[in-house]
Amino acid sequence: MSVRVRIAPSPTGDPHVGTAYMALFNMIFARHYNGTFILRIEDTDRARSRPEYEENIYSALKWANIQWDEGPDIGGAYGPYRQSERFDIYKQYAEELLSKGKAYKCFCTAAELDEMRELSAKQGGRQGYDRRCRHLTPDEIIEREQAELSYVIRLKVPLNGECVYEDAIKKRMTFPWADIDDQVLLKSDGFPTYHLANVVDDYLMKISHVIRGDEWMSSTPKHILLYESFGWTPPTFLHMPLLLGKDGKKLSKRKNPTSIFFYRDSGYLSEAFINFLTLMGYSMTGDQEIYSLDDIIREFDYKRIGVSGAIFDVQKLDWVNQQYLIKNIPVEQLWDRIKEWSFNDEFMQRLMPLCHSRIKTFGDFMDLFNFLFINHLHYNDAIFVVKDLSKEQICYLIQSLIWRLDELENWNGTGVNQASREIAEIFGVNHKKIVMPILFASLMSKTQGPPLFDSVNLLGKDRTRARLLKAMEYLGGISNKKMASLKKAWQEKSGQPLMIKD
């Protein structure tokens, strides 16, 4: 059997380090076994999927030296490789499940589903759909169809017994069917859910091994049931440990920079980055920690993949990157790599208009723009003295701005400017005297500097967000009680009471 593996990211935001992590191990697995690595785009979320996000996935993975053999951008024998181009296929297979009696039409309205959830929560019973449409008679189904009621197609999950399967990493896994909901497979608008599209695509693309994060383990019984319902042989499942933050919880952008672009723009070597990611979920033989990708591929053994979550430790990444710089980048190549990182012509041409009328001598250049070329700003209390606001109140403004910036569809200086003005209005403070000084301090560690929102364009979304988080950390953050008040104020878009001294 030929080895075929895949990753299937969704183009709904910035490329996550978890995407690179899974892509890396899929690629290593394929290369070690002389197989094929496929990139598939799961773009069925119409509200959030965007072509530019898809392009970002390609750019981020290519920066990390992750290469695929089939995909939307390069084609292949099993395309199309975007789920949005395969809707007719999913509908066909959903209808097949209906005809086999393995699925059923559910006509319940959103209001009825909400009522079910509320009732089960009050009674402390089984959470999820109560399966009322599963027992409709043929005549009742025809009656609802003739009334042109909308419906979804649900998977008919066994009411008792267990799903037992062998995971290549986690070993034998057992899930009672009573704990598994009758999963929606096809929504009322004809769009498939992840579960149907995932299984159909993996089968048609002849995927032999599914290598993914262990957050998908609870969904695997549904996928195995789908394979059995179609009469197909399931692939081998390998569930990888998740990347965790220092707090031991799933890596989250609320506390850590999670975009691949953040690490690229911060000056990490792509070779060191993938070496570091490999160490997160895998142990090489011996005590060496610096390996080339070729070494990892040659010696790879999936049995050495860890079972428990791995801590994404940026200090360890710094160490790995430094070792790569010392051992793998000759002195005569160092300046070329630094220029490639941030002193490249494209970046400097964007910077020069800001610089041209603001320096008296060339010696002023780095003093004015040093914040663009360093990763770790050094804050002090003096730069955060803003009128009579407390440190916690400054954090309210910063956190709310982060939430607002996360909502921006297009990141640019104009959008950030407008977002910051909205925050000033919500909290009833002066934009120029309060919000802008906080941004200068957070993003540049200065009380003033070059044009703020032009500078934000140069910093980019990921580094801007990371610096706002770091500023909050320096200021002491927000207590849990106050965070609850802030969330309420944010939802109501009225933060003035939080800015009034007790």
Curated annotation (Swiss-Prot):
GO biological process, one term: glutamyl-tRNA aminoacylation
GO cellular component assignments: cytosol
InterPro entries, per database record: aa-tRNA-synth_I_cd-bd, aa-tRNA-synth_I_codon-bd_sub2, aa-tRNA-synth_I_CS, aa_tRNA-synth_I_cd-bd_sf, Glu-tRNA-ligase_bac/mito, Glu/Gln-tRNA-synth, Glu/Gln-tRNA-synth_Ib_cat-dom, GluQ/Sye
Record localization: Cytoplasm
Record bears the keyword Protein biosynthesis: yes
Short motif ('KMSKS' region): ranges: 250-254
The protein's enzyme class: ligase
Main localisation: cytoplasm
Cofactors demanded by this protein: Zn(2+)
Cofactor notes: Binds 1 zinc ion per subunit.
Keywords: Aminoacyl-tRNA synthetase, ATP-binding, Cytoplasm, Ligase, Metal-binding, Nucleotide-binding, Protein biosynthesis, Zinc
Alphabetized PROSITE patterns for the sequence: AA_TRNA_LIGASE_I (PS00178)
Residue numbers binding Zn(2+): 106, 108, 133, 135
Residues binding ATP: 253
EC number: 6.1.1.17
Classification via Gene3D superfamilies: 1.10.10.350, HUPs (3.40.50.620)
Catalytic activity: tRNA(Glu) + L-glutamate + ATP = L-glutamyl-tRNA(Glu) + AMP + diphosphate
Recorded GO MF terms: ATP binding; glutamate-tRNA ligase activity; tRNA binding; zinc ion binding
Motif 'HIGH' region mapped to chain: 9-19
Recorded family membership: Belongs to the class-I aminoacyl-tRNA synthetase family. Glutamate--tRNA ligase type 1 subfamily.
Subunit-structure text: Monomer.
PANTHER family: GLUTAMATE--TRNA LIGASE (PTHR43311), GLUTAMATE--TRNA LIGASE, MITOCHONDRIAL-RELATED (PTHR43311:SF2)
Job of this protein: Catalyzes the attachment of glutamate to tRNA(Glu) in a two-step reaction: glutamate is first activated by ATP to form Glu-AMP and then transferred to the acceptor end of tRNA(Glu).
HAMAP family xrefs: Glu_tRNA_synth_type1
Protein's name in the database: Glutamate--tRNA ligase
